[in-house]
Structure formats: structure tokens, C-alpha cells
């Protein structure tokens, strides 16, 4: 019954570039061994690791009440609160819990605003009151030192996100991605690395300097969260733990 009565349009058919990217990369596998130098593998400072690793992703072992968060995010989707996110995609939608506003889901530059607004003007948006369990978890478990943009990210059934990079380098990991659900048939694929191993409740620091794309071939929305901001000491310790456990 999701989307019943809503004006959200259904996704367009996947474009040839994204389809070709999936054909070429979906089933690739590649070892992380030797990707980082020995001094990075032995690093005990999480900041140095986060800034210098070349891993495409790092699992972060923290607990996520993903079923409760899914209920809150689904309700907001059903009631038409999400906005379309970025061109060159279809069925990709977003909603800010923390940021410049609930609908400013991209960087300030995309709205003709100064870059510093990301830091200076981010706050709990009006949407935060409608997802109290999500906010509680962010405050009590994730415990970032400072949040900037924190978003629910939805890919509708049949939706896709074109191959792209979010940074101009492959050194260091960027935003945090949390799988609230991850329906069978929906995949994030990285060039040369294949499918990211998302399961409901999994958390990763992602190296978005590698080209990646998403395609939801399931019959249900795929709901994730993306965190931007400054991780606190607890979260950074879990990044280091996840790295060491998989090195």
C-alpha cells in the first residue's frame, strides 16, 4: 500500500549507461589485500585511517534498530514527504532529518548558496519530530560530534542511480551509509569491486571516489540513510574496529 494516493511518479526505464555499468561490474570480486600500505594496516589512530585508506568500504559494527527506523521512514514516504534527488537518475528520493532544511538534500552549491552553509546552517529539520526513534538512535548510539546533512535515501522499485563519483580521489572514506532495509534485487555496485554487501542494519563508511551506481530490481522501496558531518570518538573507534576485523 506504500505510495497509495501519492503523486510520486514511477521510475523511468534504466538508461543504457547504467545498465552497461551493471553488466560490466555487478559480479566482480576483488580482494582488499595489499590495497593499503602496512603502516595503514597497523594504524591505531582512526582519523589517519579514515583519511588514508583506499578500501572501497569499511564495515562499522554498531547496532541499528532498523525495523523501527524503517517504519518511521516508510510512513514519511507514504505521506509524500520525500523530494526527488539529483538528475541523471530515476526513482531516487531523499529527505533530510538534519540539514539546511528537510528538502535541501544536496550540497549548498546546488541551490546557489555559500559552501559554508553546510556547516553553519545545518540543524534538526521539521521532519525530526516525525521520526523520534531515528533521532534517539542518532543521539544515543551513533553520537557524531557534529551532524551536517543526515538523510533518508530511497530508491523506488525500478529506480536507478547513474554511475558517478562523489569525490575526486580514492584516498580516504567519505560519508556513512546505513542500510535500513535492502531488498533482494537492489544493489549498489562499485566499478571493479562489484556489489556492496549490504544487509538490513549494516553500516559502512564508503569510499565514493570509486565510481558506483544503484539499481533497484525489487518490488519494494530500498531505504538507506547517509550521514555527513564529524564522527565522534565512539563512532571512529567502531570504524577502526571494523577495519581491523576485516583486514
Q: Which functions belong to the PLM regions below?
A:
Residues 1-141:
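Non-heme Fe(II)/2-oxoglutarate
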Residues 137-159:
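A short glycine-rich, His/Asp/Glu-containing loop-to-beta-strand
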Residues 146-147, 161-175:
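A short beta-loop-beta micro-motif enriched in histidine and acidic residues
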Residues 154-156, 169-185:
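Short, conserved beta-strand element in jelly-roll/cupin
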Residues 157-159, 201, 209:
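Tight coil/turn sites that cap or link beta-strands
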Residues 162-164, 187-188, 206-218, 226:
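Short beta-strand His + acidic residue motifs that chelate non-heme Fe in jelly-roll/DSBH
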Residues 174-180, 203-205, 220-237:
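A short hydrophobic beta-strand segment most commonly corresponding to one strand
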Residues 179-199:
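A short beta-strand-loop-beta hairpin characteristic of the jelly-roll/cupin
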